[in-house]
């Protein structure tokens, strides 16, 4: 029986390839900060060959790893914040009208990261500021289809068209293969995202094809798939 390991992380898909150094169509670059507390890996899927080899759509997948992310220390969070900001700016370019979408169900803990981010976001679209601000930010928590009866992509598309959004930044929970990556890994990608993918409930994708504007997805793994734990248990039992 072919039991594949489920993961949303491009870096884990690459790790699962036997000959990871020879993957046509896939480019990989890794950077570690000065004190080696933050590792950033950029995986670029260049073409259809790369899509087939990695199992991910063409585009960039940036993975920021920091094992100390769970610690409540400003000295740890500040360099991580700077790294995340820098990578986001690289992907976003000079877009001025941004919609941040907090995907997920705030009533389900592992699926609530999107709404929690929105709760702590400083939005600016409603502010009456002199001149034209460099960045206009608005935000929405569209809920999940079981709550609204509406596909998330339809809600977001309507908002984008109404307020002329240039770029969508979607925040969501992801699924990881390794429990060691839970809560201490951030993946950014310019390929969009399927709402609910982290909890196994894929809906229509938030993508440039479906929304008519660029989509940046930011995800944090909050769950692993049961088979991952089962395989680990079987391995220990056979020792």
What are these regions (language model features)?
Residues 105-133, 139:
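Glycine-rich phosphate/diphosphate-binding loop of Rossmann-like nucleotide-binding domains
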Residues 65-67, 97-108, 139-143:
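Short glycine-rich or small-residue beta-strand-to-loop segments that form or flank ligand, phosphate
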Residues 228-235:
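Conserved small/polar residues in nucleotide/adenosyl-binding loops
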Residues 153-204:
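Glycine-rich phosphate-binding loop
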Residues 1-58:
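N-terminal amphipathic/basic leader segments beginning at the initiator methionine
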Residues 136-159:
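A structural-propensity feature for long, helix-poor, extended segments
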Residues 103-113, 146, 173-177:
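Gly/Ser/Thr-rich loops at beta-strand to alpha-helix junctions
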Residues 49-93:
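An N-terminal, well-structured beta->alpha segment
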């Amino acid at each position: 029986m072919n039991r594949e390991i489920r993961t949303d992380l491009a870096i884990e898909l690459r790790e699962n390839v036997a000959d990871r150094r020879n993957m046509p169509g896939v480019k990989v670059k890794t950077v570690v900060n000065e004190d080696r507390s933050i590792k950033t890996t950029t995986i670029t899927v260049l073409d259809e060959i790369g899509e087939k080899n990695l199992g991910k759509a063409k585009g960039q997948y940036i993975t920021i790893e920091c094992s100390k992310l769970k610690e409540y220390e400003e000295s740890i969070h500040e360099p991580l914040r700077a790294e995340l900001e820098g990578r986001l700016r690289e992907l976003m370019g000079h877009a001025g009208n941004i919609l941040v979408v907090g995907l997920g169900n705030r009533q389900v803990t592992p699926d609530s990261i999107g709404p929690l981010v929105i709760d702590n976001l400083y939005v600016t679209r409603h502010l009456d500021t002199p001149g034209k601000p460099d960045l206009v930010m608005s935000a929405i928590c569209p809920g999940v289809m079981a709550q609204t009866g509406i596909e998330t992509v339809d809600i977001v598309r309507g908002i984008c068209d109404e307020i002329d959004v240039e770029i969508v930044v979607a925040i969501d929970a992801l699924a990881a293969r390794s429990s060691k990556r839970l809560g201490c890994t951030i993946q950014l990608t310019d390929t969009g995202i399927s709402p609910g993918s982290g909890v196994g409930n894929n809906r229509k994708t938030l993508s440039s094809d479906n929304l008519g504007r660029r989509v940046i997805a930011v995800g944090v793994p909050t769950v692993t798939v049961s088979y991952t734990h089962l395989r680990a248990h079987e391995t220990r039992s056979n020792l």
